[in-house]
Protein backbone atom coordinates (compact mmCIF):
# COMPACT_ATOMS: atom_id res chain seq x y z
CA UNK A 1 0.00 0.00 0.00
CA UNK A 2 1.14 3.55 -0.72
CA UNK A 3 2.14 5.61 2.30
CA UNK A 4 2.00 9.40 2.24
CA UNK A 5 4.08 11.51 4.60
CA UNK A 6 1.85 14.54 4.96
CA UNK A 7 2.94 17.86 6.46
CA UNK A 8 -0.04 19.89 7.59
CA UNK A 9 -0.95 22.98 5.56
CA UNK A 10 1.37 22.02 2.74
CA UNK A 11 1.60 21.03 -0.89
CA UNK A 12 1.07 17.42 0.18
CA UNK A 13 -2.70 17.93 -0.06
CA UNK A 14 -2.37 17.65 -3.84
CA UNK A 15 -1.00 14.14 -3.53
CA UNK A 16 -3.91 12.96 -1.41
CA UNK A 17 -6.30 14.51 -3.91
CA UNK A 18 -4.56 12.74 -6.80
CA UNK A 19 -4.67 9.41 -4.98
CA UNK A 20 -8.38 9.88 -4.42
CA UNK A 21 -8.95 10.74 -8.09
CA UNK A 22 -7.11 7.55 -9.05
CA UNK A 23 -9.12 5.49 -6.57
CA UNK A 24 -6.02 4.11 -4.86
CA UNK A 25 -5.72 2.81 -1.33
CA UNK A 26 -3.15 4.56 0.83
CA UNK A 27 -2.33 5.45 4.39
CA UNK A 28 -1.31 8.84 5.73
CA UNK A 29 1.24 9.78 8.35
CA UNK A 30 0.57 13.37 9.42
CA UNK A 31 3.37 15.66 10.60
CA UNK A 32 2.62 18.89 12.46
CA UNK A 33 4.64 22.02 11.88
CA UNK A 34 6.68 23.43 14.74
CA UNK A 35 6.26 26.87 16.28
CA UNK A 36 8.65 28.15 13.60
CA UNK A 37 6.25 26.79 10.93
CA UNK A 38 8.90 24.40 9.67
CA UNK A 39 8.58 20.67 9.14
CA UNK A 40 9.64 18.50 12.09
CA UNK A 41 13.08 16.94 11.98
CA UNK A 42 11.50 13.48 11.96
CA UNK A 43 10.74 13.92 8.26
CA UNK A 44 14.49 13.59 7.66
CA UNK A 45 14.14 9.99 8.76
CA UNK A 46 12.04 9.51 5.63
CA UNK A 47 13.98 11.65 3.15
CA UNK A 48 17.33 13.43 3.60
CA UNK A 49 15.85 16.86 2.84
CA UNK A 50 13.06 16.49 5.38
CA UNK A 51 10.42 17.87 3.05
CA UNK A 52 6.83 16.93 2.27
CA UNK A 53 5.20 15.46 0.28
CA UNK A 54 7.01 12.17 0.25
CA UNK A 55 5.43 8.84 -0.60
CA UNK A 56 6.53 5.26 -0.15
CA UNK A 57 5.46 2.65 -2.67
CA UNK A 58 6.87 -0.80 -3.24
CA UNK A 59 9.72 -0.17 -0.83
CA UNK A 60 10.87 2.95 -2.67
CA UNK A 61 10.74 6.61 -1.67
CA UNK A 62 9.44 9.29 -4.02
CA UNK A 63 9.77 13.02 -3.33
CA UNK A 64 8.96 16.32 -5.07
CA UNK A 65 5.34 17.09 -5.89
CA UNK A 66 5.70 17.10 -9.66
CA UNK A 67 7.73 13.90 -9.71
CA UNK A 68 5.20 12.18 -7.45
CA UNK A 69 2.33 13.29 -9.66
CA UNK A 70 4.09 11.95 -12.75
CA UNK A 71 4.96 8.68 -11.02
CA UNK A 72 1.42 8.02 -9.81
CA UNK A 73 -0.17 8.85 -13.16
CA UNK A 74 2.43 6.82 -15.07
CA UNK A 75 2.06 3.84 -12.76
CA UNK A 76 -1.63 3.82 -11.90
CA UNK A 77 -3.38 6.29 -14.17
CA UNK A 78 -4.40 3.89 -16.97
CA UNK A 79 -4.71 6.87 -19.30
CA UNK A 80 -6.57 9.09 -16.85
CA UNK A 81 -5.58 12.61 -15.80
CA UNK A 82 -3.14 13.04 -18.68
CA UNK A 83 -3.92 14.07 -22.28
CA UNK A 84 -2.80 11.93 -25.18
CA UNK A 85 0.85 12.47 -26.08
CA UNK A 86 1.50 14.59 -29.14
CA UNK A 87 -1.60 16.72 -28.68
CA UNK A 88 -1.76 20.40 -27.85
CA UNK A 89 -3.46 19.48 -24.58
CA UNK A 90 -0.50 17.26 -23.69
CA UNK A 91 1.97 20.08 -24.33
CA UNK A 92 -0.07 22.34 -22.08
CA UNK A 93 -0.18 19.57 -19.49
CA UNK A 94 3.61 19.25 -19.43
CA UNK A 95 4.04 23.02 -19.27
CA UNK A 96 1.69 23.61 -16.34
CA UNK A 97 2.91 20.55 -14.46
CA UNK A 98 6.43 21.99 -14.44
CA UNK A 99 5.39 25.63 -14.18
CA UNK A 100 3.65 25.00 -10.84
CA UNK A 101 6.88 24.32 -8.96
CA UNK A 102 9.35 25.93 -11.36
CA UNK A 103 7.81 29.39 -11.74
CA UNK A 104 4.78 29.91 -9.51
CA UNK A 105 5.95 28.51 -6.19
CA UNK A 106 9.36 30.27 -5.99
CA UNK A 107 7.62 33.65 -6.19
CA UNK A 108 5.03 32.69 -3.59
CA UNK A 109 7.69 31.36 -1.24
CA UNK A 110 9.73 34.56 -1.63
CA UNK A 111 6.61 36.59 -0.88
CA UNK A 112 6.10 34.64 2.34
CA UNK A 113 9.74 34.73 3.43
CA UNK A 114 10.22 38.45 2.87
CA UNK A 115 7.05 39.17 4.84
CA UNK A 116 8.58 37.34 7.81
CA UNK A 117 12.11 38.74 7.70
CA UNK A 118 11.41 41.78 9.93
CA UNK A 119 10.21 39.49 12.73
CA UNK A 120 13.41 37.44 12.61
CA UNK A 121 15.91 40.23 13.31
CA UNK A 122 16.72 42.12 16.54
CA UNK A 123 14.20 44.80 17.50
CA UNK A 124 16.46 47.75 16.70
CA UNK A 125 17.06 46.45 13.19
CA UNK A 126 13.41 45.84 12.35
CA UNK A 127 12.73 49.26 10.76
CA UNK A 128 15.61 48.71 8.33
CA UNK A 129 14.63 45.09 7.69
CA UNK A 130 11.04 46.19 7.06
CA UNK A 131 12.13 48.79 4.51
CA UNK A 132 14.29 46.26 2.69
CA UNK A 133 11.60 43.57 2.71
CA UNK A 134 8.90 45.92 1.47
CA UNK A 135 11.24 47.29 -1.17
CA UNK A 136 12.04 43.85 -2.57
CA UNK A 137 8.37 42.91 -2.51
CA UNK A 138 7.13 46.07 -4.23
CA UNK A 139 9.90 46.30 -6.83
CA UNK A 140 10.44 42.64 -7.69
CA UNK A 141 8.10 40.06 -6.18
CA UNK A 142 4.69 41.75 -6.42
CA UNK A 143 4.99 42.86 -10.07
CA UNK A 144 5.96 39.34 -11.13
CA UNK A 145 3.14 37.82 -9.13
CA UNK A 146 0.72 40.26 -10.74
CA UNK A 147 1.89 39.14 -14.19
CA UNK A 148 1.56 35.48 -13.26
CA UNK A 149 -1.93 35.89 -11.83
CA UNK A 150 -3.01 37.70 -15.00
CA UNK A 151 -1.58 34.78 -16.98
CA UNK A 152 -3.59 32.27 -14.94
CA UNK A 153 -6.75 34.27 -15.39
CA UNK A 154 -6.23 34.45 -19.15
CA UNK A 155 -5.60 30.71 -19.49
CA UNK A 156 -8.45 29.68 -17.20
CA UNK A 157 -10.84 31.97 -19.04
CA UNK A 158 -10.55 29.69 -22.09
CA UNK A 159 -12.16 26.54 -20.70
CA UNK A 160 -12.01 26.62 -16.91
CA UNK A 161 -8.99 24.36 -16.42
CA UNK A 162 -5.31 24.71 -17.20
CA UNK A 163 -5.02 22.01 -19.87
CA UNK A 164 -8.43 21.87 -21.48
CA UNK A 165 -11.91 20.81 -20.59
CA UNK A 166 -10.96 17.79 -18.46
CA UNK A 167 -9.10 17.62 -15.17
CA UNK A 168 -5.45 16.53 -15.42
CA UNK A 169 -2.49 16.12 -13.12
CA UNK A 170 -1.40 19.61 -14.12
CA UNK A 171 -4.58 21.07 -12.65
CA UNK A 172 -3.85 19.18 -9.45
CA UNK A 173 -0.28 20.53 -9.47
CA UNK A 174 -1.52 24.09 -9.97
CA UNK A 175 -4.10 23.90 -7.19
CA UNK A 176 -1.65 24.77 -4.44
CA UNK A 177 -0.07 27.82 -6.12
CA UNK A 178 -3.52 29.20 -6.87
CA UNK A 179 -4.83 28.50 -3.37
CA UNK A 180 -1.71 29.98 -1.77
CA UNK A 181 -1.96 33.07 -3.96
CA UNK A 182 -5.50 33.65 -2.72
CA UNK A 183 -4.11 34.31 0.75
CA UNK A 184 -0.83 36.01 -0.20
CA UNK A 185 -1.47 38.11 -3.30
CA UNK A 186 -3.81 41.08 -3.42
CA UNK A 187 -6.62 40.96 -5.94
CA UNK A 188 -6.55 37.26 -6.80
CA UNK A 189 -9.97 36.64 -5.29
CA UNK A 190 -11.44 39.21 -7.69
CA UNK A 191 -10.43 37.19 -10.76
CA UNK A 192 -13.58 35.37 -11.98
CA UNK A 193 -11.89 32.55 -13.90
CA UNK A 194 -9.54 31.78 -11.01
CA UNK A 195 -12.44 31.83 -8.58
CA UNK A 196 -14.41 29.46 -10.81
CA UNK A 197 -11.42 27.12 -11.11
CA UNK A 198 -11.15 26.88 -7.32
CA UNK A 199 -14.87 26.35 -6.91
CA UNK A 200 -14.75 23.62 -9.56
CA UNK A 201 -11.87 21.62 -8.10
CA UNK A 202 -13.09 21.98 -4.52
CA UNK A 203 -16.49 20.61 -5.47
CA UNK A 204 -14.95 17.36 -6.67
CA UNK A 205 -15.69 14.43 -4.33
CA UNK A 206 -12.04 13.32 -4.48
CA UNK A 207 -10.85 16.75 -3.29
CA UNK A 208 -13.27 16.64 -0.37
CA UNK A 209 -12.23 13.10 0.58
CA UNK A 210 -8.59 14.22 0.59
CA UNK A 211 -9.45 17.00 3.03
CA UNK A 212 -11.01 14.49 5.41
CA UNK A 213 -8.10 12.06 5.23
CA UNK A 214 -5.29 14.60 5.51
CA UNK A 215 -4.17 16.93 8.22
CA UNK A 216 -4.92 20.62 8.49
CA UNK A 217 -5.12 22.50 5.19
CA UNK A 218 -6.02 26.15 5.68
CA UNK A 219 -5.74 26.99 1.99
CA UNK A 220 -9.02 25.24 1.24
CA UNK A 221 -10.77 28.12 3.01
CA UNK A 222 -9.40 30.91 0.84
Region annotations inferred by a language model:
Residues 67, 193, 206:
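Residue-level recognition of oxygen-bearing side chains
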Residues 32, 169, 214:
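Short, solvent-exposed turn/loop segments enriched in Gly/Ser/Thr/Pro and often Arg
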Residues 45, 203, 212-213:
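Phosphate-coordinating loops and pocket residues in cytosolic domains that bind phosphorylated ligands
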Residues 1-131, 135:
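GST-like domain detector, emphasizing the conserved glutathione-binding G-site
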Residues 132, 214-222:
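Acidic/histidine-enriched, glycine/proline-rich intrinsically disordered or flexible terminal extensions
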Residues 79-84, 106-108, 161-165, 190, ...:
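Short, hydrophobic secondary-structure boundary micro-motifs
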Residues 100-203:
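GST-like fold's C-terminal all-alpha helical module
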